[in-house]
Regions:
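FMN-binding flavodoxin-like domain, especially the glycine-rich phosphate-binding loop
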Residues: 2-4, 14-17, 21-29, 34-41, ...
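Short polar catalytic/cofactor-binding loops
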Residues: 9-13
């Protein structure tokens, strides 16, 4: 069973609610999900998951401190061991929603592979945001099935339109 880490920082509860929806989407798609508040996340958590969903509220156009602290603590223990691991971020905000850029920048430092655009939610998650967050979880669960697995060669007689015999 694939594992998805949902790690977040929430001040008003909106990001926690968003994290719960992402987790529900991944669980519904068959993944085992570990939602954690940034201050409770352990530096080795990224090593123990197949995909990650970092999320934060807007903290002056930057990610919240608990998420940043977690990423700081996790960097050296995971360096070189999470390259190309799938991730997709989510953010909540009151108007601008620029904190997603800071999460994306640090994900690049970790060399993670973004598999979906950041879901940006203004205020409390409403109907469309809930659908987008749930889809983010589903996407993460699906990505974990293929991460690190090269295409499988299939032995069959090639057809005219399948000269390589590679299954996806």
């Amino acid at each position: 069973m694939t594992k998805v880490l949902v790690v977040y920082c929430s001040m008003s509860g909106n990001t926690r609610a968003a994290a719960e929806v992402v987790a529900a989407g991944a669980k519904g798609a068959g993944a085992r999900v570990t939602p954690k508040e940034g201050s409770q996340a352990r530096p080795q958590d990224p090593l123990e998951c197949d995909a990650a969903a970092p999320g934060s509220h807007d903290a002056f156009s930057y990610m919240g401190g608990a998420l940043k602290d977690f990423l700081d603590r996790a960097f050296y223990p995971t360096q070189g061991h999470v390259t190309d691991k799938p991730y997709a971020a989510f953010v909540t905000h009151g108007g601008e929603g620029k904190e997603g850029k800071s999460i994306e920048s640090l994900a690049q430092v970790f060399k993670l592979k973004r598999i979906a655009p950041t879901v940006s939610v203004q205020g409390e998650p409403a109907r469309q945001a809930i659908a987008d967050l749930e889809e983010l979880g589903v996407t993460l669960a699906a990505a974990t099935r293929t991460w690190g697995n090269p295409p499988r060669l299939v032995s069959h007689r090639p057809h005219a339109d399948d000269s390589l015999g590679v299954a996806s």
